[in-house]
């Protein structure tokens, strides 16, 4: 593993202007639109007539050091080193951490941490489009308070269009995302710089003493305000999650030399404005503008928030696909919106889920300031899970001494925990929403994983070891018929139930029998050279292990074509695929509780078939039912 990850399929990480602009359009949409609401939410705890200059400087100092510690040091300098063959993200980090340990118990703990991070990500993915679009459209109220009644309808319309166009793909529109975000960052940076020239004393907030003094002076109120300060770093996870698309170096360079300076200029500009005019604290971002430019800025901000929302939605699709490949979610339909870019996907169930929840959040909360109370807790929970996984990888994979690991990641973890605990105070003020969504997803993932493990366990108990079956085969009087039969099996050491049922009912066996097991080795991509492992068990009987990465979509016929190129004596066009379809019944002593079993059965019934998921031609498939009690 290299310090700078190389994106899959890329010859290297050469810095090109087009690549840097592309990074801006995908990676920084979320964190780049945080100035719309972060300062406003942080100042909301202080009435305008009681707002002191020292309070503004203290909050700015906390925002500055949050960006330095959480984003720059933690993600840009440390966690982006821990790539999984070029890929980033919580589940990718989880898979890497599980690869570097042999302990089943440790793997289980790592899996739970990864599941928690992924579940909380979905909680965050519902809040981001809602608060981003609302905060942008609310700029109309600065033009005229009478326009307030149009904010919700316009926000709903923008969200409706955003989710509707997902099915058509974002490749064409995505080409414009980068240049638009360049304009966005330049504009917000220039607006802030203008105010800093007017009141340069605001730069004193760069000194951490002001942040520390603010905390000591206001104690509990300062602790509560941390829950809004963290809004400035929401979207930091995207820097790590999108490594596979762009590589580490372009993301680091664009952050350090463009995005971070522009964000800091805007934050400090808002602070300078509020120091001069405390009443601007009601919406400091839009009060940076001359009145005549507010409407154009509302339009630009709305476009920027749509880009931010698009990045989160695409991230949710990617996490859903990874979860499916890693066995954490049932098989779901995945549509490719670009024939040449397998990263551009559309997952209908995820899109529908996000759309419904986002609309309900907009209608339920009604304003970005109300949503700010719900925002943050899921993000900070993800920060904690990522920090724990990264600490394990640094200790085991990079061989850091335990003392150094604890010192570095312990210090960062304290910052993450401070942000998380301050957001816990907002649980009853809306923070329960992303928590409920996150823990619902965690329950779904753990239930699916547990249910599949029980199915595998019961199937194994009722199955015949493959060695025993092959030992009896030469003495049997089973009629061999022409053709090739492929039997899918979850365990290569046991005889597939579909084969036993076929023998029981049809009394024949094909001349060529291939047992196929699909595995995920915990890496994002597997090249064709490593795709298949073939073993001839006896005359005409083969065992094939196929490996697919968690960023790939398995295609069994295409993988078997590779075997023909290696000299395996069968024609894929003559293959019949035999699959088992489970019928679940309640066991005498159930191992899944009533509610979890109901959830598992619902997911099992609604999962797409193995035929569709593995891209197997439906006219070549024979399905045989199997009853399993759990």
Swiss-Prot record:
GO molecular function, one term: symporter activity
Membrane protein topology class: Multi-pass membrane protein
Bilayer-crossing regions: 19-39, 59-79, 108-128, 145-165, 173-193, 220-240, 255-275, 284-304, 345-365, 374-394, 405-425, 427-447
Gene Ontology CC: one annotated term: plasma membrane
Subcellular location: Cell inner membrane
Pfam hit, one: K_trans
Catalytic activity: K(+)(in) + H(+)(in) = K(+)(out) + H(+)(out)
Domain of life from the UniProt record: Bacteria
Keywords assigned: Cell inner membrane, Cell membrane, Ion transport, Membrane, Potassium, Potassium transport, Symport, Transmembrane, Transmembrane helix, Transport
Main location: membrane
Function summary: Transport of potassium into the cell. Likely operates as a K(+):H(+) symporter.
Protein family (similarity comment): Belongs to the HAK/KUP transporter (TC 2.A.72) family.
HAMAP family, alphabetized: Kup
UniProt name for this protein: Probable potassium transport system protein Kup
Gene name of the encoded protein: kup
């Amino acid at each position: 593993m290299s310090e700078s990850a190389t994106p899959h399929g890329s010859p290297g990480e050469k810095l090109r202007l087009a690549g840097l602009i592309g990074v801006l359009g995908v990676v920084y949409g979320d964190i780049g639109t945080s100035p719309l609401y972060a300062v406003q939410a942080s100042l909301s705890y202080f009435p305008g007539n009681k707002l002191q200059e020292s309070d503004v400087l203290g909050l700015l100092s906390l925002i500055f050091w949050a960006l330095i510690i959480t984003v720059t040091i933690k993600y840009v300098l440390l966690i982006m080193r821990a790539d999984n063959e070029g890929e980033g993200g919580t589940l990718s980090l989880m898979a890497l951490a599980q690869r570097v340990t042999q302990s089943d118990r440790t793997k289980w703990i790592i899996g739970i941490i990864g599941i928690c991070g992924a579940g909380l990500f979905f909680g965050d993915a519902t809040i981001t489009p809602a608060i981003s679009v609302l905060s942008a459209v609310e700029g109309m109220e600065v033009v005229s308070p009478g326009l307030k009644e149009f904010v919700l309808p316009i926000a709903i319309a923008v969200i409706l269009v955003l989710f509707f166009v997902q099915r058509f793909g974002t490749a064409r529109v995505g080409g414009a995302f980068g240049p638009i975000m360049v304009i966005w960052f330049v504009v917000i940076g220039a607006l802030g710089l203008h105010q800093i020239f007017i009141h340069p004393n605001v730069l004193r907030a760069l000194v951490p003493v002001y942040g520390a003094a603010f905390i000591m002076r206001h104690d509990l109120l300062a602790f509560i305000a941390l829950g809004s300060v963290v809004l400035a770093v929401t979207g930091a996870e995207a820097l790590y999650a999108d490594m596979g698309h762009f590589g580490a170096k372009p993301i680091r360079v664009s952050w350090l030399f463009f995005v971070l300076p522009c964000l800091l200029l805007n934050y400090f500009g808002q602070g300078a404005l509020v120091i001069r005019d405390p009443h601007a604290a009601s919406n400091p971002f839009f009060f940076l503008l001359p009145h005549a430019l507010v409407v154009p800025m509302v339009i630009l901000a709305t476009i920027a928030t749509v880009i931010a929302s698009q990045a989160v939605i695409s991230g949710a699709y990617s996490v859903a696909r990874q979860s499916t490949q890693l066995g954490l979610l049932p098989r779901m339909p995945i549509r490719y919106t670009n024939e040449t870019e397998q990263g551009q996907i559309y997952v209908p169930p995820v899109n529908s889920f996000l759309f419904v929840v986002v609309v309900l959040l907009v209608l339920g909360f009604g304003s970005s300031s109300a949503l700010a109370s719900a925002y943050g807790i899921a993000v900070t929970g993800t920060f904690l899970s990522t920090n724990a996984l990264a600490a394990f990888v640094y200790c085991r994979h990079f061989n850091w001494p335990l003392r150094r690991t604890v010192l570095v990641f312990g210090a960062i973890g304290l910052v993450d925990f401070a942000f998380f605990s301050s957001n816990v105070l907002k649980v009853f003020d809306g923070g329960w929403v992303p928590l409920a969504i996150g823990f619902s997803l965690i329950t779904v993932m753990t239930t699916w994983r547990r249910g599949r493990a029980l199915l595998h366990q019961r199937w194994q108990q009722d199955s015949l070891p493959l060695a025993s079956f092959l030992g009896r085969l030469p003495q049997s009087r089973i009629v061999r018929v022409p053709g090739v039969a492929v039997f899918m099996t979850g365990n290569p050491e046991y005889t597939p139930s579909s084969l036993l049922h076929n023998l029981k009912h049809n009394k024949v066996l094909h001349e060529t029998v291939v047992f196929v097991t699909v595995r995920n080795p915990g890496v994002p991509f597997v090249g064709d050279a490593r795709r298949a492992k073939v073993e001839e068990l006896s005359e005409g009987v083969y065992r094939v292990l196929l490996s697919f990465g968690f960023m790939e979509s398995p295609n069994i016929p295409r993988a078997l074509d590779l075997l023909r190129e290696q000299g395996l004596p069968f024609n894929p066009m003559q293959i019949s695929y035999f699959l088992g379809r489970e019928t679940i019944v309640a066991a005498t002593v159930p191992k899944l509780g009533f509610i979890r079993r109901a959830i598992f059965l619902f997911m099992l019934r609604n999962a797409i078939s193995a035929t569709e998921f593995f891209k197997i031609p439906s006219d070549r498939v024979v399905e045989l039912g199997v009853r399993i009690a759990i």
